[in-house]
Amino acid sequence: MSKRMVSLFLSAVMFVVCSFGATATYAAENIESAIIDGKEYRCESRIVDDKEYMYITNITDEITDVVYYDVCSGIIFLNGKPVAYVENAVSFPDEKSIESVSPLATTGWRYHDTSNHRISWARGVAAATLAGIIAAVIPSTGWLSVLTKIGATALSAVSAACIGGNVKCVAYTQVLASGKVQCRYDWTFRPSSGESYGPYSSYKL
């Protein structure tokens, strides 16, 4: 299982944390590719000094953007400069809602929590970069998944039209026959321009 740029959920507990560990060696974690407006893009997740970075490369034009989400400060950096800010709000189930089942899932799923992430970005950022910013706040969801589900055309329009939006993520869990806990995340992206994209689903063991 590959690490993501930011781990907002740990196992079935799934709490946002600030981690401080020993210096890690450079490692390539995951590589995804896509064609956007006739240009080839590659997204590579790397770990440098225990921090996860997303390298988004426009191979056609030989341009690379580096995205890093600092979980503790809530700031997303693009090429070393703050380009987006994340405000997180997490709600946990009460006695009535704890039995809720995901509308996108079969029976057996139990509601865990709902998180809302208000994100902002610099107007006109590339669609590929905006996909990376959105993916940064969704557990177990890669850059390519966001790009393909929302669509490059829609992301380009959103980037040009506004500078902020909301990412809502509803988490569910179920216990498999093996005894392992599987997590499901149903997420929706709503830019301030009014459109709604989703819900889409991602999974994690």
Where are the model-predicted features located?
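Sec-dependent N-terminal signal peptides of Gram-positive bacterial secreted proteins and lipoproteins
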Residues: 2-26
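Membrane-interfacial hairpin junctions
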Residues: 138-147
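Transmembrane alpha-helical hairpins and terminal membrane-anchor modules
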Residues: 149-166
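N-terminal propeptides/leader regions of secreted preproproteins
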Residues: 21-116
